[in-house]
């Protein structure tokens, strides 16, 4: 039996997303806040993305830092998000954080639900 090392594919945190997180953190006046991205069961395609601000980081969380702010992902969610890009977009449909996920085989029209 052999042991193989596993290096997870990075999660990309775009400058647009980092800038928006920084703006929101500054508005709250709490520099301990981090953007937590997670995956839960549900939505029209089986899984859905969620975003929240969190002060706490668990020992097994993945942390991605850019421009002085942090994005945090728990290990269960990371397996679905490895290689994905977290971005922030503004357009006619409004403004929101979006995930471009190469692991998703299908996504719903709103972009917040996916299947593998």
Curated annotation (Swiss-Prot):
Keywords: Iron, Iron-sulfur, Metal-binding. The lineage of its organism: Bacteria, Pseudomonadati, Pseudomonadota, Gammaproteobacteria, Pseudomonadales. Belongs to the HesB/IscA family. Its cofactor is iron-sulfur cluster. The gene is erpA. One of its GO terms (cellular component) is cytosol. Gene3D superfamilies: HesB-like domain. It comes from the Bacteria. InterPro entries: FeS_biogenesis (IPR000361), FeS_cluster_insertion (IPR016092), FeS_cluster_insertion_CS (IPR017870), FeS_cluster_insertion_RrpA (IPR023063), HesB-like_dom_sf (IPR035903). Required for insertion of 4Fe-4S clusters for at least IspG. This is Iron-sulfur cluster insertion protein ErpA. GO terms for biological process: iron-sulfur cluster assembly. Binds 1 iron-sulfur cluster per subunit. Iron-sulfur cluster binds at residues 44, 108, 110. Homodimer. GO terms for molecular function: 2 iron, 2 sulfur cluster binding; 4 iron, 4 sulfur cluster binding; iron ion binding.
């Amino acid at each position: 039996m052999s042991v193989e090392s596993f290096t997870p594919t990075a999660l990309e945190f775009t400058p647009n997303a980092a800038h928006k997180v920084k703006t929101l953190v500054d508005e709250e006046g709490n520099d301990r806040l981090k953007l937590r991205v997670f995956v839960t069961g549900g939505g029209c395609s089986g899984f859905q993305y969620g975003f929240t601000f969190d002060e706490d980081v668990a020992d097994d969380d993945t942390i991605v830092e850019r421009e002085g702010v942090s994005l945090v992902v728990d290990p269960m969610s990371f397996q679905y998000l490895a290689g994905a890009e977290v971005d922030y977009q503004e357009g006619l449909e409004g403004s929101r954080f979006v995930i471009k996920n190469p692991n998703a085989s299908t996504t719903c029209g709103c972009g917040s639900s996916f299947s593998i």
